[in-house]
Amino acid sequence: MACGGKRLLFLALAWVLLAHLCSQAEAASNYDCCLSYIQTPLPSRAIVGFTRQMADEACDINAIIFHTKKRKSVCADPKQNWVKRAVNLLSLRVKKM
């Protein structure tokens, strides 16, 4: 009977581990990622915030996701100069608050 109990415990633990891994995979696949970048710069007055997307997390590319006054999310290349300037400007605004 002890052998049967150990087997049942092993199967229960394996099931819990499998359920956890499946939920992690589902969470990563539901993540909304940038797949490309906007080609034209956004006016800085239209941008109200930003989020950083990192390629080493759930997405394939690094990106800055700008949030606009019209509640749009726009993906931009973090290597572009206009993107760097906009991020710096927004960071300064936050520091002044």
UniProtKB/Swiss-Prot annotation:
Where does tissue-level expression of this protein occur?
Answer: Thymic medulla (at protein level). Prominently expressed in the small intestine, colon and appendix. Also found in thymus, spleen, lymph node and lung. The long form might be dominant in intestinal, and the short form in lymphoid tissues. Expressed by IL17 producing helper T-cells (Th17).
Q: Where in the cell is it found?
A: Secreted
Where the protein is mainly located, per its record? secreted
One Pfam family from the UniProt entry?
A: IL8
PROSITE patterns assigned: SMALL_CYTOKINES_CC
Q: Does the keyword Secreted apply?
A: yes
Q: What induces it?
A: By lipopolysaccharide (LPS), TNF-alpha and interleukin-1. IFN-gamma alone showed no effect, but potentiated the effect of TNF. Induced synergistically by TGFB1 and IL6, which requires STAT3, RORC and IL21.
SUPFAM superfamilies to which the protein is assigned, alphabetical:
Interleukin 8-like chemokines (SSF54117)
Annotated S-S bridges: C33-C59, C34-C75
Q: Recorded GO terms, molecular function?
A: CCR6 chemokine receptor binding; chemokine activity; cytokine activity
One record GO biological process: cell chemotaxis
Q: Which keywords does this Swiss-Prot/TrEMBL entry list?
A: Chemotaxis, Cytokine, Disulfide bond, Inflammatory response, Secreted, Signal
GO CC terms in record: extracellular space
Residue span of the signal peptide, if any? 1-27
Which InterPro entries does the UniProt record give?
A: Chemokine_b/g/d, Chemokine_CC_CS, Chemokine_CC_DCCL, Chemokine_IL8-like_dom, Interleukin_8-like_sf
What is known about what this protein does? Acts as a ligand for C-C chemokine receptor CCR6. Signals through binding and activation of CCR6 and induces a strong chemotactic response and mobilization of intracellular calcium ions. The ligand-receptor pair CCL20-CCR6 is responsible for the chemotaxis of dendritic cells (DC), effector/memory T-cells and B-cells and plays an important role at skin and mucosal surfaces under homeostatic and inflammatory conditions, as well as in pathology, including cancer and autoimmune diseases. CCL20 acts as a chemotactic factor that attracts lymphocytes and, slightly, neutrophils, but not monocytes.
Family of this protein: Belongs to the intercrine beta (chemokine CC) family.
| Name listed for the protein in its UniProt record | C-C motif chemokine 20
Q: Taxonomy-wise, where does this protein's organism fall, top ranks first?
A: Eukaryota, Metazoa, Chordata, Craniata, Vertebrata
